[in-house]
């Protein structure tokens, strides 16, 4: 009998299929991991304006999903996505403690793509206080990194490294900060810091950028690598290759948005 390593994603459902739980499960499947979702909310989009509407699920229903996945099946790694409330963050933190969960990946999801505003301040503060000290790695973009590190902004490689040091000093075991297209040069730069050394991962920026779901895909790929027994650095490097291929071969799903291609790493990796 062939057994697969298992991973849990605690995230919202993106009805367009590009981000959230849908991106996570696709990524896990592509990397040979049995993925399980615990849905926190359902996100819908207006068909012509693409305006988002978020419908949270009751806290007790989220908890029942966690019990099913963790007690009923078992997990080798887990990640978070959109949590959306301080109460939900508290539930996740308590769950990590209750089951002594390992290989915990926190994707903070504090801002929407292209936005510099923290969406739910009380949830963001709870992530900072409760989940950051409990995680094996956290995967903020530069806006989220500035918030987590108590810095006014993070816009340069030097500031990314400073933020990374502060985030690890605040309790995270490691961090990878996604510079991506927010930095001003022509490279998409992510920087991994494990508390001892920095690893810069730079690839040319990809235009046009069909990047809906890129952050979710990246953190899910890290989670998958950890579930499969890779070291943290190995998991991060594999995830960078996976998401780069997904972006390079991204595609438009309508005339408003384009998504990462989750099959690209398998089909087109060179």
Model-derived segments and spans:
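Phosphate-handling active-site elements
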Residues: 31-36, 198-199, 225-238
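Conserved N-terminal subdomain of the carbohydrate kinase-like
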Residues: 2-9, 25-113, 117-118
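Short, small-residue alpha-helix embedded
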Residues: 146-147, 208-232
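Glycine-rich beta-alpha junction loops
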Residues: 14, 42-43, 84, 110-112, ...
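Conserved phosphate/ATP/ADP-binding segment of small-molecule kinases
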Residues: 121-198
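Short pre-catalytic strand/loop immediately N-terminal to key active-site residues, enriched for Gly-Thr
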Residues: 10-16, 198-212
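Charged C-terminal helix
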Residues: 233-270
């Amino acid at each position: 009998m062939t057994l697969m390593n298992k991973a849990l994603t605690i995230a919202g459902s993106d009805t367009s299929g590009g981000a959230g739980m849908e991106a996570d499960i696709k990524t896990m499947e592509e990397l040979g991991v049995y993925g399980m979702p615990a849905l926190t909310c359902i996100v819908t989009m207006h068909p012509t304006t693409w305006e988002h509407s978020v419908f949270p699920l009751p806290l007790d229903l989220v908890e029942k999903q966690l019990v099913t996945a963790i007690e009923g099946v078992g997990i080798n790694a887990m990640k978070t996505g959109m949590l959306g409330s301080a109460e939900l963050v508290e539930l996740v933190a308590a769950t990590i403690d209750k089951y002594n969960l390992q290989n915990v990946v926190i994707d903070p999801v504090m801002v929407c793509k292209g936005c510099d505003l923290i969406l739910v301040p009380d949830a963001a503060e709870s992530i900072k206080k409760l989940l950051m000290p409990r995680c094996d790695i956290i995967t903020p973009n530069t806006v989220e990194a500035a918030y987590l590190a108590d810095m006014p902004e993070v816009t340069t490689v030097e500031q990314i490294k400073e933020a990374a040091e502060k985030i690890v000093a605040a309790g995270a075991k490691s961090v990878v900060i996604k510079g991506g297209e927010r930095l001003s040069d022509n490279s998409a730069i992510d920087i991994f810091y494990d508390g001892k050394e920095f690893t810069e991962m730079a690839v040319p920026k990809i235009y046009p950028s069909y990047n809906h779901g890129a952050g979710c895909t990246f953190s899910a790929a890290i989670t998958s690598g950890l579930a499969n027994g890779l070291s943290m650095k190995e998991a991060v490097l594999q995830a960078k290759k996976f998401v780069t291929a997904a972006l390079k071969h991204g595609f438009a799903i309508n005339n408003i948005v384009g998504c990462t291609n989750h099959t690209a790493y398998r089909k087109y990796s060179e």
